Amino acid sequence: MSAIQRWLDRFCYKHPRFGIPNLMLVIVVGNVLVWLMDQFSYGVSLSALLAFSPYYILHGQIWRIITFVFVPLDSNLFFLAVSLYFYYMIGSVLEREWGTAKFNVFYGLGVLLNVVVGFLLYAVTAPLYPSHLLPLLTTASMTYVNLSLFFAFATLYPNMQVLLFFIIPIKIKWLAWIDAALFGWSVLSSLFGVFTSGLAALPGVIIPLVAILNYFIFFWDNFLQLFGRVKYQTSRQTVNFKKATKQAQQQKG
């Protein structure tokens, strides 16, 4: 276990009441309220007032550092409802598995990392835009936080089945592998862009990896165990092959 993971476990053990109980319920209710306000407000978008805009944050609207977590990722009611239900479900399961403190640390760390990424992205991209467009730049959302939440759930419950398109039963691990492949392809495409287009494409490599760093911190031991198990199984098979070859030679002799 890494030093960071040991520290996290000790912190959560000593502070079991740290954080907000039923955090995902708070997030879901907040998203629903903001969506409703957007639908019934005329000329004023609450989402625009809460979104992560570094320009406005640096000009005093510091609430945006937190309130962007309540900005809906979809304006379509059906897709928003499905998304919120899904993330409420997996978030609630993770909170029961880990406890309130550890789940809040995981989620809060994801939000913090995306705030850092948002400011980094703004620092890189702001010089490319005229000054009158800077207020329109929103450089962080809950996309990567939700992705890290999904990866965490799939790691702990890989064989749980869900209905894809409400029809096709599929294990959660296969959906996670698909998301991981798309995520990896996006990073590799940006990495290729560094060699073809220059350093302007570098944020596309660094930012996604930093944004889901909370997942890697919490599940680093799982990666080590996975690679260790594969290495062990490969080594064991090699030894068995040598023994089988030697036995076959002895039988021929």
Name each region found by the language model.
Residues 103-107, 165, 175:
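Alpha-helical transmembrane segments and their helix-entry boundary regions
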Residues 119-123, 178-195:
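Hydrophobic alpha-helical transmembrane segments in multi-pass integral membrane proteins
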Residues 124, 128, 132-161, 169-174:
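Membrane-interface micro-motifs in multi-pass membrane enzymes
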Residues 16-116, 122-126, 130-132, 197-203:
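N-terminal TM1-TM2 helical hairpin plus the immediately adjacent luminal interfacial "cap"
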